[in-house]
Amino acid sequence: MTIRSPEPEVKKVKVVVDRDTVKTSFEKWAKPGHFSRTLAKGPDTTTWIWNLHADAHDFDSHTNNLEDISRKIFSAHFGQLAIIFIWLSGMYYHGARFSNYEAWLADPTHIKPSAQIVWPIVGQEILNGDVGGGFRGIQITSGFFQIWRASGITSELQLYCTAIGALIFAALMLFAGWFHYHKAAPKLAWFQEVESMLNHHLAGLLGLGSLSWAGHQIHVSLPINQLLDAGVDPKEIPLPHEFIFNRDLLAQLYPSFAKGVTPFLTLNWSEYSDFLTFRGGLNPVTGGLWLTDTAHHHLAIAVLFLIAGHMYKTNWRIGHNLKDLLEAHKGPFTGEGHKGLYEILTTSWHAQLAVNLAMLGSLTIVVAHHMYSMPPYPYLATDYGTQLSLFTHHMWIGGFIIVGAAAHAAIFMVRDYDPTTQYNNLLDRVLRHRDAIVSHLNWVCIFLGFHSFGLYIHNDTMSALGRPQDMFSDTAIQLQPIFAQWIQNTHASAPGSTAPGATASTSLTWGGGDLVTVGSKVALLPIPLGTADFLVHHIHAFTIHVTVLILLKGVLFARSSRLIPDKANLGFRFPCDGPGRGGTCQVSAWDHVFLGLFWMYNAISVVIFHFSWKMQSDVWGNISDQGVVTHITGGNFAQSSITINGWLRDFLWAQASQVIQSYGSSLSAYGLLFLGAHFVWAFSLMFLFSGRGYWQELIESIVWAHNKLKVAPAIQPRALSIVQGRAVGVAHYLLGGIVTTWAFFLARIIAIG
């Protein structure tokens, strides 16, 4: 008798929905706090409005039904997309209605981008600066003009049409959000169908998304940009649909188009190398990446993701099963390995979100570093204001997203983690040796902090004593970043050895002596690294490690600690462990996110200061007819940034002159923002450095005075809770700091760049 193991059941993936789940009604809109029994009663004290805002989107607190929570999140995503489409539509509409896009397109080296004109009310029209070509408006640094040119947009009419299209898509998204919550709401099983979701997201979003963009680039962007680069008047260039429907037009520019798909079907793919290139480096006309390289890149990415989108098992017997994959991962030292993680990621959206935010935040920072080193759009590299803005923007956003990852990881630990189902797997093992992790990380932070700061203090002291020969610098005691220089050199010498088809390295910043200039401005050149970079790099290492220490400690000790063993019962955010237990304040997971934000701010500030000064000193500048490059700050980074005094004197103070002296000019708004944002930042300290009782006492006196005059309010005033005060404090601290930096950077770079 043969015993057969039962055939593994092939699950059937179906789209399952519930019809007419929630009645559509506007009545709830008139009942603030309808989602909570306590809030729905209405306000007794002013705390009500704070709790209303804190809990409005905390779907976990509205219900513990995972299916309903999933549907709310899904529906909210469509609302988010609608907002994005409305915002994009506004950007394109401004380009169509209020901008000098067509003038910029005709002469991008002499005309600056502007898409906002201030109305003449009480003299505000002073903000309309002369951006060239007789146009007066606010100079913008968002990079939209450059991306429009790369897309092949040649007229303001096309921008109008796109703006209208975006509004139509916004309406569609709003409809979809309503439809999939009220009319046809997916069942929980659909949200947990990970293999199908992976296939569709990989093949659909990333695969077909990249393929359609590659198609647009090949059929529309490439020919239009080729003609623009050759100096053809934008009004003479055929419209996009003419290129799409008339192959002969394309064949004039790219001869392989005349052959159609024959080379593709006969595997002679190299025939297409006239529009799918592998050149490396930058286009000397525009200072951007070769658009034929980027089209090739998107086509390759599309192929990879289309394959990736067919790797996971759904209704057929072929492909990976994610649960099996995770549970098969057992190393010799990792116990049960990934066992149990599948259940976590399919039942806790906080855990899922934490992983995704950590990835997305890191990717955003990677984008920041590639935008300047491999500028993807025409004339982006020589628009210094835009380069600085894009780098700063992506660094800030990446920092915030990474802190968000820690926040949601901690919420997962508090609300969704079930210790009974997680035994000896990786998560359990990390939690069991959390003391070793945190204490070692703490040691690393102390080491990095003392040593990195100590190098600067040494230099300041030697400088003050008049002993330059004893300083750490490129001209005295050298601390060269030899590993970074080795990586630069490896990449600079790659073309011809490891990448035989490439004519230049991936980025000019690696080295090799080439420099690209556009209209007598430097687009990019090899970036030298020396002692100054070595020093500031270790400050980066220090601030990043401290941020990680705070955030990771918050996650690892979110449920319990030696100080508060029952922390999980107190929730994600709480001020202290009740009265009578001193020294237990500021230990909640929320407080760790709060503290982590300040160190994230420290970390990103040092990065953007480093970038701003380094680029002005060693990269950005003008080139004379004789080929001599003059940098904006004349290469002073290497000698000035090696002391704290140098950073204060030659960077912050020297470069603040433009924003401080901006009054009476078209940059005066930045001067006012600089002043106002300092005030907002200082205002935050009032919330961060004072206790709740102080304000409650003050409020009691004020209420007494109102009672005397018989004008006492029906809703009782209350001081902010400890957590609310800290939230308001950190929000103003970050807003004030970021706007101060924004005004400082832009006034400087627009005035001189």
Swiss-Prot record:
Question: Reaction catalysed by this chain?
Answer: reduced [plastocyanin] + hnu + oxidized [2Fe-2S]-[ferredoxin] = oxidized [plastocyanin] + reduced [2Fe-2S]-[ferredoxin]
Biological process (GO) annotations held by this record are: photosynthesis
**One of this protein's Pfam families, by short name?**
PsaA_PsaB
What's the EC number here?
1.97.1.12
Task: From the record, give the transmembrane residue ranges.
Answer: 73-96, 159-182, 198-222, 294-312, 349-372, 388-414, 436-458, 534-552, 592-613, 667-689, 727-747
Q: Where, by residue number, does [4Fe-4S] cluster bind?
A: C576, C585
Identify a single GO molecular function assigned to this protein. Answer: oxidoreductase activity
Q: What are the disulfide bonds? A: none
SUPFAM superfamilies, from UniProt?
Photosystem I subunits PsaA/PsaB
Q: What is this protein called?
A: Photosystem I P700 chlorophyll a apoprotein A1
| Source organism of this protein record | Pinus thunbergii (Japanese black pine)
